[in-house]
Amino acid sequence: VLLAVGLPAAAQNLTSVRILLGVGDTTPTRWDGTLQVAGGSMVSLDPWRFEGSDGISGATWHFSTHPVRLFSGTSPTSTAGNNIVANGVIATISTASSDAEIKITTAQGDFGFRLGELTYGKPVSRLEGKVHLDRIPVSTQITNTKEEEDFPAAAAGKNGEVWVAYIQFHHNPEHNALRAALDSPPKDFSKWKSPTGGDQVFMRKYANGTWGDPIPVTESGLDAFKTSIAVDGQGRPWVFWSQNARFPSRIPNFEIFARVMPGGQPGKRIQISNDPGNDVAPVAATDSKGNVWVAWQGWRNGKAAILAATQSGSEFGPAQIVSKAPANQWNPAIAADQKGRVTVAWDTYRNENYDIYMRTAVDGNWGPETPVAATARYEAYPSIAYENTGRLWVAYEEGGKGWGKDFGAYNTPGVAVYQGRAIRVRGFEPDGRVVQTVTDPGASLPGFPSIHFDKGGLQKDFEKLDPDPENAKTRKPDTGARNMQNARNNFPRLTVDSSGRIWLAVRSAHPVFWSPIGTVWTEFLISYDGKGWTNPIFLNHSDNLLDNKPALVSTQPGQLLVVNSSDKRRRYDLGEAINSPLGIMPTRKEDPYENDLYASTIDLGVASQPLAVADAPPVQVAGAEAVADKTDLAALKKIRDYTINTSAGDLKIVRGEFHRHSEISMDGGGDGSIIDQYRYALDAGSLDWVGCCDHDNGAGREYTWWLSQKLTDIFYSPGTFTPMFSYERSVNYPEGHRNVIFAQRGVRTLPRQPITEENQNVHAPDTQSLYAYLKAFNGIAAAHTSATGMGTDWRDNDPLAEPVVEIYQGDRQNYEMPDAPRSNSEKDSIGLWRPKGFVSLALAKGYKLGFQASSDHISTHMSYCNLLAKDTSRESLLDAFQKRHVYGATDNILADVRSGPHIMGDAFATAEQPNLHVKLSGTSKFSKVVVIKDNNYVYSTEPGTSQVEFSWRDNSPTKGKTSYYYVRGEQDTGDIVWASPMWITYTGK
């Protein structure tokens, strides 16, 4: 039960209370109950963690406590011990005073409380600790459509009003489904290429406690990404957005657009950027003269830069490049003070790790770049705001050293993408001195996400962010490297109100909970009143993906309005599915989840003045020399400089992978945001291409598919970096999980058909339909973890639709053959033991499969799919896959294996005895290099050098027989390279 759309909390004197019941329960327990208000009335009840038959009727609820819902082992916590978690309701109550009494009757006992007992950040208990009560901000739903409203931005007007911009995505009604299943094989695949309704930018006004109607800023049918808004000195709101100006062209071009909206009426539309590189992520602020500034991320000459432009009347001046380093720059943030200063902050990979820099313009003249946080640790995602005193506050994420470097089942000297984040806050005085609040925000923010809301601890107690090399060395059989038990607080949003009170919102998965569309992340708010930070305040209806940034705006001292989108994923009961024969994928015809906008209001009173601050250490810059892996950089240069000469033209080695997961996957709770996967690929991984391969692009939901497709185009930088359109299609053994890849945008994910039984020696109808679908859209697929419960017994293959296999993945093991290095075994198989799935058995059946390696979940920097391609265009990369011109490796190892004019992956006939010429260039010494023919070792050498080159001839071929030959190289570091087989038919002379 929700508040009426647009119903202003202030107009009703509303208070919201989170009532959690069954704290500490060890078995599922009934907590049916009723709420009564003396001196007021109940306005609404929201469910907390409902599932099954849990329900609400008026002021009465019927529910139990339940075992926590988690998916697989990729959740950032464990269910060891008691896994029964509290359930509850969120009550919104209208009262005339804080003396109102609330009485609650439950099946486990009765209790009561006075509203005045509850203050923000100070929970109370009842029934000997089995009941938890805390006051939370009232959340008002401000959109309620069947479409998706997302990416809100907000700005205060001159008269206390608030303007909100956002994007609305319009569904194709035929595809607004959640994992819809197929009853029979499709005969026509055209519906899986049908268009969406696209995006449209809207604006709304909030004034005098009332939300106005949506105001269209653009037409519908766009391909748009993120908004920003600012109000100029004349009181006119300016709305900014990024839009693919070439949509639906094959080559995207996102540009920054703006429209002034005087009095809420659309004015002239302006294109601010104009460059072949994509321009995205606008942020805006208004300077002391009333001019609006906008900053954004734009791709120039193959690298992402930070740019800015300034309003001049009803136009904007030319774009200026703010960042100067020749590395990728990310996440611009902007703020202006009342003395003519405008500051833009961002994070940069200039020092071979992420650091934060800022640059300030005074009266329009840019000063030098200044480091904000530049240690050897990961520092990213700044959010900035000025105090009235001219002090600039910066909040940002801090992670461990070695972010995005080697992490997987066999090696953990680095830190994976989402292995821990702490939020830091520091201030910069006008004279450059660095200060900090007198108490640590880490003593208020959530710690390591726990399944129990009261057990997570605090950030300050979970800050062992740096790598643990012993992690992989001490892993248990059948399990991967352990998730590091750190705080995971992300995407800080900071603002300062006119009294000087600092407001900080952060994203957390605490308490951990899984829904049918994935892990639940929510927003927590803390505030610094000049003396100390409040305890965390939960924001209702903030449940959504990890990368979900609310808009914070204050129009009165001590008060805050938070506008955010929620896809309602905390409501497990909305998406509960019927039992399905489709392996891990439940099925439901309609999609009950969609994004709406909500507004939360909170009043904590004015801050103490002046704010108490303490001196902080000056910023130290570690620099690239202290961070860079010179061996890695040299190996990358050698690979990129290398050319393979063939009769069909020169080929380059194009490094990448197409099996990375993110928040979009239903089991992506340990993987991090999807944009962080691109950050990893572009920077820490230094890849040339990537496929962000989430499960069905998010449970087969149209909206997350649309976002995934959009980002695949946003990060496309022709000639420099090539994202491919990719997803994982998971069907349990014996049919198998497969990663799908296309060179074209717009192909939707294919639903499932019923799975075949393991003891049935038949072709799988679902897999056969997948092959037909791939051929219809010129795509390919690759099975992964083939000798596990996610694998296949190789009952199916199509040489055109499935030309390669993921022979190795960093998150788990090698599936080449039994007893090969890093292969799984009956005693140690991460993801169950299914020996019929070894790749050697597929090759023995005559299947022609090239070899590639990719990461899967969590793992970084140790799985590479190296394509031998004419160039880096999407079409050339797909062509290399289809020709099996590919090799897999766990490090940046160069491999060139030929037979006469033929290269790895080729199938051909010869009258000569088959011969191989092998050239390997490693990152360390090769301890062994072997040649394998028809699943037998036929040659082995132990070179003890990093450079290997030799020729080998098969002196005993069988005339008329086709044999496959491939090379495996093993380094003394344990790293491996697999050159794809060649299939050679010996015809004899």
Where are these regions (language model features)?
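Short acidic/polar inter-strand loop motif in beta-rich domains
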Residues: 109-111, 568-572, 971-978
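Bacterial N-terminal signal peptides
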Residues: 1-6
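Extracellular Ig-like/FN3 beta-sandwich strand-entry sites
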Residues: 97-99, 499, 557, 960-964
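Extracellular, repeat-based ectodomains that mediate carbohydrate processing or recognition
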Residues: 60-64, 75-84, 112-631
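Sec/Tat signal peptide C-region and signal peptidase I cleavage site
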Residues: 7-11
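Low-complexity, serine/threonine/proline/glycine-rich extracellular segments that form mucin-like
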Residues: 14-55
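Extended, charged catalytic domains and RNA/DNA-binding interfaces, predominantly
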Residues: 538, 589-989
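Low-complexity, intrinsically disordered segments enriched in Ser/Thr together with acidic residues
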Residues: 68-107
